[in-house]
Amino acid sequence: MTKRDQNEVLFERAQKTIPGGVNSPVRAFRQVGGTPRFISKAKGPYFWDAENKRYIDLIMSWGPMIAGHANPEVVEAVQKAAETSFSYGAPTEGEIELAERICALVPSIEQVRMVSSGTEATMSALRLARGYTNRDLIIKFEGCYHGHADSLLVKAGSGLLTFADSTQNAPSSGGVPQDLVKHTLVLPYNDVEAIEAVFKKQGNEIAAVILEPIAGNMNLIKPSAEFLKALRDLTSQYGSVLIYDEVMTGFRVALGGAQSLQGIVPDLTCLGKVMGGGMPMAAFGGKKEIMSKLAPLGNVYQAGTLSGNPVAVAAGLKTLEIVSRAGFYECLSAQTEKLMLGLKQGADKSGIPFAVDSVGGMFGFYFADAVPSTYEAVTKTNIDAFKKFFHLMLDEGVYLAPSAYEAGFTSIAHDDAVLQVIIDAAEKSFPQLR
């Protein structure tokens, strides 16, 4: 009797008690097909599945594991913190240290509030912006994903590009009333004329503009300088709050986040992923004038039992210490660029239309002639080619994001030898796409 693949066994078992067999939709392999890999352990740039097959990981928990899986320094910090307790439900000195560190690294953040997920961070930031301005309308952009808060599930990116019909001016998810999203205006990313027109018409009603300063949930899309300048100028002119959702880009693309590369000073910033070192941890912060509206000082309520728990704080503090070391981001950026160059050269040899882009330890590749700059352009890339490439690389032991609409991530553990294995696997795979 042939032994069944243990990933299949676990997936079948999972579907009996977990909806779809996964706890986050993109993990289900719906866009690429096949059986999700169930992970048993990870170390450095690698993880092992239920069959004990080793893969080079190019999602790194969707960004947080910038120092590599099971980094010994982070593990030691977590173990030490766990010896005292997992959670107190009361303030700790560690929370202060982490807040001070974040404020020092991201100058636009004068005060910061810890939460447990990126969704909590963006949801709370929007509530705060509305409370501060006494306005209801918010602007988001097509293909940008800001978590699964109801008012933000309109033409959203990430798994929603796979699972929902996002071409309609309606909620991208069931269970979200049309009435609730009527206060959410959705505009094309990188469209200066659209943002100018909306502010001219409704500027005095707009509480906030929220965006990914480098979009990573419709693959990787960079904003134009003109687009960012228009956003900053118009929000300042009309008294709206500019919110940078740096849950993905914060401490991932640069020590000061995307805003430090772009020269833009947002009013509020949302952080997550890297700042927790892989633990459930996020935050939102910004101008003291705005943050002072939060309870217990102001009338904008936000709370969380596990917010700022000591184990997550310890992981975050140690991770931020590691990424603050001299040369960290220069090395990370160089390695990511080297990987993208290798993939591009491999595709060119096989005559495959293929475009690449990267910033810091974040990258995107597209089966297209050029790097897209809009949501619409991303949806027109060759998704079928991506699906085939994904499985060819998976067979070679390289784990890519299981969706053409997600960015990829490297870590400081992805050294030259690891990169060469990836490039060799790609050079073997590309000819099979012709």
From Swiss-Prot:
UniProt keywords, alphabetically: Cytoplasm, Isomerase, Porphyrin biosynthesis, Pyridoxal phosphate
Reactions catalysed according to its record: (S)-4-amino-5-oxopentanoate = 5-aminolevulinate
Keyword hit for Metal-binding: no
This protein's GO CC annotations: cytoplasm
Pathway info: Porphyrin-containing compound metabolism; protoporphyrin-IX biosynthesis; 5-aminolevulinate from L-glutamyl-tRNA(Glu): step 2/2
Necessary cofactors: pyridoxal 5'-phosphate
Main location: cytoplasm
This enzyme's EC code(s): 5.4.3.8
GO biological process: protoporphyrinogen IX biosynthetic process
Top EC class for this record: isomerase
Residue numbers carrying N6-(pyridoxal phosphate)lysine: K273
Compartments, record wording: Cytoplasm
GO molecular function: glutamate-1-semialdehyde 2,1-aminomutase activity; pyridoxal phosphate binding; transaminase activity
InterPro entries noted in UniProt: 4pyrrol_synth_GluAld_NH2Trfase, Aminotrans_3, Aminotrans_3_PPA_site, PyrdxlP-dep_Trfase, PyrdxlP-dep_Trfase_major, PyrdxlP-dep_Trfase_small
Family annotation (NCBIfam families): hemL, PRK00062.1
UniProt family annotation: Belongs to the class-III pyridoxal-phosphate-dependent aminotransferase family. HemL subfamily.
PANTHER family for this protein: GLUTAMATE-1-SEMIALDEHYDE 2,1-AMINOMUTASE, GLUTAMATE-1-SEMIALDEHYDE 2,1-AMINOMUTASE 1, CHLOROPLASTIC-RELATED
Subunit structure: Homodimer.
Name of protein: Glutamate-1-semialdehyde 2,1-aminomutase
Species of the source: Polynucleobacter asymbioticus (strain DSM 18221 / CIP 109841 / QLW-P1DMWA-1)
